[in-house]
Amino acid sequence: MKPSIVAKLEALQERHEEVQALLGEPSVIADMDRFRALSREYAQLTDITRCFQQWQQAQEDQQTAEMMLDDPEMRDMAQEELKEGKATIEALEQQLQVLLLPKDPDDERGCFLEVRAGTGGDEAAIFAGDLFRMYSRYAESRRWRVEVMSASDGEHGGYKEVIAKISGDGVYGQLKFESGGHRVQRVPATESQGRIHTSACTVAVMAEVPEAELPDINPADLRIDTFRSSGAGGQHVNTTDSAIRITHLPTGIVVECQDERSQHKNKAKALSVLGARIRAAEVQKRQQEEASTRRNLLGSGDRSDRIRTYNFPQGRVTDHRINLTLYRLDEVMEGKLDTLIQPVVQEYQADQLAALSEQE
């Protein structure tokens, strides 16, 4: 490992001890925002420090094994230990490089998840419902909280569009690669001839950010319309115009919210989603400029970018970005998404490492 990387790891080890001491100080404990920020930093540094300590121990073990080579009785065992130790050190160095990659500050935040029916009519809306259920089950398995912000029901089930806020640790970091086009191939329940239909939905994942970090929105740039809500899931039909539609005139972004009975609450929710959308568009533009010379697994921001196909007759799901095919569709639709998400995360990290190597 390069001396510069070892020096950086030693500095982080010192910072880990420093943060540990700070977390025990009464002034820090009394300041909840600072305490949370330091706790997050401590958790990240703990992973790096633990891995670095394992690497240091492996290096010491290698030196001990090399000294044993001079002893004829111990030589065979020493050679075996050196071989195993070399593999261990290489694996730890790879892990440390990943841990040292620049962190996306949004990764630890919650997110807004949008699922929208695309081509395919009723079947697309039904599939949008299936996708939302899939993400909800995944969130449940991670002990995240899902709150529906707005939902427009499909005529025969599912959703024309559903927006939810998902809260918890590391939500955005896990779900941000889900943005893009999701295609389904299956025989609809209404199909009497048994023909396979192809439908599509689009998914957008945007980081939830504190109000202080949201972009400044000029009230003059907003057109706010009220309309009568059909209520969440078609229930509790309102007799007042409590639903809100906000249009951001400079960008054309439109957000609707009708989940609450209170117009004030719907407006607050819609504004938070609008702010997240505007910020996401700005971040996406910057990422595209930075990654213009290499592929961007986060997608182009174009909802029509197809990232995944779900083929029900074959029980197959394919991620087109990394050419990954799994025959575990039933498990995936039940929310077991790590087998799809983790390979994309790893590929993204490999791309980051390659980009850093090019810079060096």
Swiss-Prot record:
A GO term for molecular function: translation release factor activity, codon specific
Cysteine disulfide partners in this protein: none
Family matches, as Pfam families: PCRF (PF03462), RF-1 (PF00472)
Localization per Swiss-Prot or TrEMBL: Cytoplasm
Annotated InterPro entries: PCRF (IPR005139), Pep_chain_release_fac_I (IPR000352), Pep_chain_release_fac_I_sf (IPR045853), Prokaryotic/Mito_RF (IPR050057), RF-1 (IPR004373)
Posttranslational modification: Methylated by PrmC. Methylation increases the termination efficiency of RF1.
Keywords: Cytoplasm, Methylation, Protein biosynthesis
Gene3D superfamilies: 3.30.160.20, 3.30.70.1660, 6.10.140.1950
Modified-residue entries (N5-methylglutamine), positions: Q235
Biased composition (Basic and acidic residues): 284-293
Gene Ontology CC annotation, any one: cytoplasm
Region Disordered: start-end pairs: 284-305
SMART domains for the chain: PCRF
Family affiliation: Belongs to the prokaryotic/mitochondrial release factor family.
Annotated function: Peptide chain release factor 1 directs the termination of translation in response to the peptide chain termination codons UAG and UAA.
Protein name per its UniProtKB record: Peptide chain release factor 1
UniProt source species: Pectobacterium carotovorum subsp. carotovorum (strain PC1)
Gene that this polypeptide is encoded by: prfA
